[in-house]
Amino acid sequence: LVGSEMCIRDRCMAVCVQAQKKNFSYKFYGQVRGDLFYNSRANAEIGDGSFHLYPKDVALDADGKDLNASPNGSFYLLYSRLGIDVQGPKVGSAKTSLKLEADFRGSGSNWAVLRIRHAYVNLDWGKSAVLIGQTWHPLFGEVFPQMLNLSTGAPFQPFNRSPQIRYRYTDNGWQLTGSVLWQLQYLSAGPNGKSEEYIKNSCVPEVYLGVDYKKPGWQVGAGMEILSLVPRTQNEVDGKIYKVSERVSSVSGEAHVKYQDANWLVMAKTLLASNLTQTCMLGGYGVTSIDPRTGEQEYSPYLFSTSWLNIVYGKKWKPGLFLGYLKNLGANEALVGKTYGVGLDVDQVFTTNLQLSYNLPHWKLGVEYSPSIAWYGNVDLQDGGRIHDTHSITNHRVLGVLIYTF
């Protein structure tokens, strides 16, 4: 009798589990990706050579030889990935879904370690939707370059996935987006290098507001981002430690456009980027005043102007062109102390990407050639850190990519 009761109970549990599963649908996906690349000289990079930003300046040794004028290259499969999309039962009138996606990039120098790319739930009421979790930063958005390089247009295009709470309203072609964001893998620069502590100590999340209008074949939009960081909470002067109250706030804006038909894809975006180092862009801030007793500092953020254009044609054979340009506009005030950021010694960067890919169902094989020019010079702190008397440095990058998706 006991055995019969256990059997009946197990069958009931199996029926209940099966009934619950009927309310869910699952879609597994992924890709194996190999990146083979060559650079003619050393470059500023994110983590490894797969994520290229711009060429480094001349660094002379004792014999007057350029230490950075050495080629490099490698072959990586770190950005292969696995993911799952789940459609769940309704919560009230809201459709529910979630996404989990990971690759093997790891973090820092810990390569070939599983890393979360996306992890979020989404509640969709039709016109309104709320997303909670980690996904693409809204500055990355729906308009981003179609290219082979993993940088996807950085440092001209924001590149970032962050924990966030996002509200989106869609009606009659209009799409309104509001997000509050925190930092996890993509971090702001500051006195202790790149760290989460600056936004954590701020207690104020990053804020984004944007609007898009869509019609068949077209999308246009604009957005604004606000970031407020606390660089330090204490400082030491002559062996004495003082509590300090510091904050640096910045506002960035962007506008974008996209056209697509059966064969053509044309996109462009322009930004006024202020202290967007957490998005793999150039930027940061500098010290404008220092309290002589406590060492407490005030700051001014740098402003960078960036723009890019991307054109891709075809279906099976896809030639493409990407053009990116950025300019260091400096800070609004004279600087009297240290600067913190990425690429603050760079005046301009111009990059061209020429790509050709062969596409089949589940397969992509492509090659890309990318000459990149950076201008360096003398940093004038009294002029807000702007660069004068510049000279140019060029890197030639060749990339081969093989991708199998499922």
PLM regions: where:
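Boundary at the C-terminal end of the N-terminal hydrophobic targeting segment
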Residues: A14-K21
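Extracellular loop and loop/strand-boundary signature of outer-membrane beta-barrel proteins
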Residues: L67-S70, R105, L148-G153, S188-E197, ...
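Transmembrane beta-barrel outer-membrane domains
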Residues: K21, G73-Y79, W111-H118, F156-N160, ...
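Outer-membrane beta-barrel "beta-signal"
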Residues: L360, T390-F406
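Outer-membrane beta-barrel proteins
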Residues: N39-N43, S109-W111, G141-P145, Q185-G190, ...
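Short, small-residue-biased leader/transition segments that mark boundaries at the very start
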Residues: L1-I8
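Outer membrane beta-barrel
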Residues: K21-D48, V58-Y186, C203-V204, Y208, ...
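Detector for outer-membrane/organellar transmembrane beta-barrel domains
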Residues: G217-V346
